[in-house]
């Protein structure tokens, strides 16, 4: 396996050999000053991070209290400070306050800070010459202050992100930790009993040790499954993991420890798309189950990615899996983590339900837009148009009587009404509701009794006159030709008669 040397790019100091300084500057002093500068910058960066984290956390607690007051406390009580204090103490821990290395131990509690805010806002209104006893003015002042806090919080988080990136870009002694380690312990002959493992849904210590020992002894390098050519493709193991029921966490943990390569972005996303497939078939139970299993993979992968290991490290990934299940899933003392996880699962389930309905509706609309194949009558030649011919209902002619009989018996009543209007649009409108096979048979009936005819279209009077002249000329030519033929025939007879007479005389 190739060794990744990129992590050494983060080291800020090099050895003496490649440090170039001015000839008048002592190299050792320069390196010492450089070290000192780096340590000072690192210390300042860490202090800034701690201060901003404390600030963001404090604003979060204060906003929570202010929002609860604005939502649940009657507006008329906003100017009554004792009522505000009573409400705060009833809904929040009155002793809760900000803590940390950079926080003054004597700092006021969160409830006291909110009370001070109300007092200060009332004083500010008095200074501006406004009525500080007006609940609506107090509410407006609180909302303005709340907006300022939000703005400051956004800036603080933005600055924090920059500091985190800067910190992660360099290696320091804080980042050094034990990778692989082993030790021997003498067996205890007597004395205190070893701690007994408390009953838990988690894997037993023995089972976990067996899995980790297998990983440690395995000499075959593992890689994350990634079907780059087919992002929707699921590995057999991943599909099997998706079939594990929601509440079988121990089984899920054991399965992941034994199938580490499936914890990849591609497999996690492919499993989530499988949930879409189940939902489109109306299977809510399997949809929720597959989403739940996909989220387990997603949370574990996200934690592992924070370690910035660009390949599959079996021991590290196994530690992450065990830590996740221990701290989030099986942690009964602090259930917030599991609640947050399940909330995320539920949100994705609702999202997939909503998206599936939209996709089904779009497919239905598209199908309706394409429509059913129908027959429409239209002339294909611009110089002609179709006309509707009705049979003669009063005629005694056998042919016409036959057409009338076919018209009344083989043509649907609705189509008969459309034909009687002699309007082609009305006929086409009826054709829209007739299946293609039936419409084709109806066209054959039309053809048999000459319902639809074709007539030529003359664009103007000049065309009509030209056609008329052409007809008359053709008629005249035909007449002259007949006369000529008659004359020729008559002359031939006389010649024969003369000839025959001469023969007789001779």
Swiss-Prot record:
The modification Phosphoserine is found at residues 14, 17, 367, 466, 484. Keywords: Cell cycle, Cell division, Chaperone, Cytoplasm, Phosphoprotein. Disulfide bonds: none annotated. InterPro entries: Cdc37, Cdc37_C, Cdc37_Hsp90-bd, Cdc37_Hsp90-bd_sf, Cdc37_N_dom. Forms a complex with Hsp90. Interacts with CDC28, CAK1 HOG1, SLT2 and STE11. Residues 486-506 have a biased composition (Basic and acidic residues). One of its GO terms (molecular function) is heat shock protein binding. GO terms for cellular component: cytoplasm. Gene3D superfamilies: Cdc37, Hsp90 binding domain. Co-chaperone that binds to numerous kinases and promotes their interaction with the Hsp90 complex, resulting in stabilization and promotion of their activity. Involved in both the HOG and the PKC MAP kinase signaling cascade necessary for adaptation to stress conditions due to high osmolarity or cell wall perturbation. GO terms for biological process: cell division; cellular hyperosmotic response; fungal-type cell wall organization or biogenesis; p38MAPK cascade; positive regulation of MAPK cascade; protein folding; protein stabilization; regulation of cell cycle. Present with 10200 molecules/cell in log phase SD medium. It is found in: Cytoplasm. It holds the Pfam family CDC37_N. This is Hsp90 co-chaperone Cdc37. The keyword Flavoprotein does not apply. Residues 472-506 are annotated as: Disordered. Phosphorylation at Ser-14 is required for the interactions with HOG1 and SLT2 MAP kinases and is crucial for adaptation to stress conditions due to high osmolarity or cell wall perturbation. Coiled coil: none annotated. Belongs to the CDC37 family. The keyword Hydrolase does not apply. The lineage of its organism: Eukaryota, Fungi, Dikarya, Ascomycota, Saccharomycotina. Its main location: cytoplasm.
């Amino acid at each position: 396996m190739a060794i990744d040397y990129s992590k050494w790019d983060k080291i800020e100091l090099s050895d003496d050999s490649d440090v170039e300084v001015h000839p008048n500057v002592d190299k050792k002093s320069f390196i010492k000053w450089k070290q000192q500068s780096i340590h000072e910058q690192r210390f300042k960066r860490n202090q800034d991070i701690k201060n901003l984290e404390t600030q963001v956390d404090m604003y979060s607690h204060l906003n929570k209290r202010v929002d609860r007051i604005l939502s649940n406390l009657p507006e008329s009580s906003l100017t009554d400070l004792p009522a505000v204090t009573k409400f705060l103490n009833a809904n929040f821990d009155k002793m809760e306050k900000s803590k940390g290395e950079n926080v003054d131990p004597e700092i006021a509690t969160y409830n006291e800070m909110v009370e001070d805010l109300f007092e200060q806002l009332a004083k500010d209104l008095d200074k501006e010459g406004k009525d500080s006893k007006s609940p609506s003015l107090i509410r407006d002042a609180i909302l303005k202050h709340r907006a300022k806090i939000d703005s400051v919080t956004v800036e603080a988080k933005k600055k924090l992100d920059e500091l985190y990136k800067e910190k992660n870009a360099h290696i320091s002694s804080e980042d050094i930790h034990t990778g692989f380690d082993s030790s021997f312990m003498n067996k205890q002959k007597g004395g205190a009993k070893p701690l007994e493992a408390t009953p838990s849904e988690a894997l037993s210590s023995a089972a976990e040790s067996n899995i980790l020992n297998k990983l440690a002894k395995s000499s075959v390098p593992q890689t994350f499954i990634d079907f780059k050519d087919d992002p929707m493709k699921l590995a057999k193991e991943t599909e099997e993991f998706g079939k594990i029921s929601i509440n079988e966490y121990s089984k899920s943990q054991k399965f992941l420890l034994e199938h580490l390569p499936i914890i990849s972005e591609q497999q996690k996303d492919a499993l989530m798309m499988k949930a879409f497939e189940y939902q489109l078939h109306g299977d809510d139970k399997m949809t929720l189950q597959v989403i739940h299993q996909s989220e387990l993979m997603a949370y574990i992968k996200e934690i592992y990615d924070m370690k910035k290991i660009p390949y599959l490290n079996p021991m590290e990934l196994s530690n992450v899996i065990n830590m996740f299940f221990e701290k989030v899933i099986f942690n009964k003392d602090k259930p917030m983590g599991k609640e947050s996880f399940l909330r995320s699962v539920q949100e994705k389930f609702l999202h997939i339900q909503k998206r599936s309905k939209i996709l089904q509706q779009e497919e239905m609309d598209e199908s309706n837009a394409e429509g059913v194949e129908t027959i429409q009558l239209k002339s294909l030649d611009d110089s002609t148009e179709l006309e509707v011919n009705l049979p003669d209902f009063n005629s005694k002619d056998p042919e016409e009587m036959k057409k009338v009989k076919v018209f009344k018996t083989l043509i649907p009543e609705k189509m008969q009404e459309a034909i009687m209007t002699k309007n082609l649009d009305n006929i086409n409108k009826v054709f829209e509701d007739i299946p293609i096979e039936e419409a084709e048979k109806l066209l054959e009936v039309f053809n048999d009794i000459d319902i639809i005819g074709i007539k030529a279209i003359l664009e103007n009077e000049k065309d009509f006159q030209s056609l008329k002249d052409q007809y008359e000329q053709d008629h005249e030519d035909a007449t002259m030709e007949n006369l000529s033929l008659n004359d020729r025939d008559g002359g031939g007879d006389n010649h024969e008669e003369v000839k025959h007479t001469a023969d007789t005389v001779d």
